[in-house]
Amino acid sequence: MKIQHVLIAASLVALSGLAQAQVDPLHVRSWAASCAACHGTDGRAQPGMISLAGVPKEVTIQKMLDYKAGRMPAATIMHQLSKGYSDEQISAIAGYFAAQKN
């Protein structure tokens, strides 16, 4: 009986990791679309705004987490927007923009 519980627990851990690794690309695109008003379609911004296309994933993740934690100035709406995403969503959005050509 004890072995059965261990096997079930191990299976659940393995499956949860798999579920986290596979984020639906359509969800990621819809999350990233909320950035288009300021940062342009696919992260290619108009002059005067920061482009996100091609920015390394780690850089975008860190900035978003800094906004979310209140470590960045509140001069924009980013501190509010970033709180609406989980860390996993932020990582997925950052990966999406990193993959875009600038």
Predicted ranges, named:
Residues 1-8:
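Bacterial N-terminal signal peptides that target proteins for export
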Residues 13-32, 48-50, 66, 101:
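Electrostatic cytochrome c docking/interface patches
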Residues 28, 42-71, 80-85:
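Gly/Gly-Pro-rich "capping" loops immediately C-terminal to redox-active cysteine motifs
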Residues 33-41, 93:
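The canonical Cys-X-X-Cys-His
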Residues 44, 73, 100-102:
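Inter-heme linker and motif-flanking segments adjacent to c-type heme-binding CXXCH motifs
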Residues 83-102:
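C-terminal capping alpha-helices of c-type cytochrome domains
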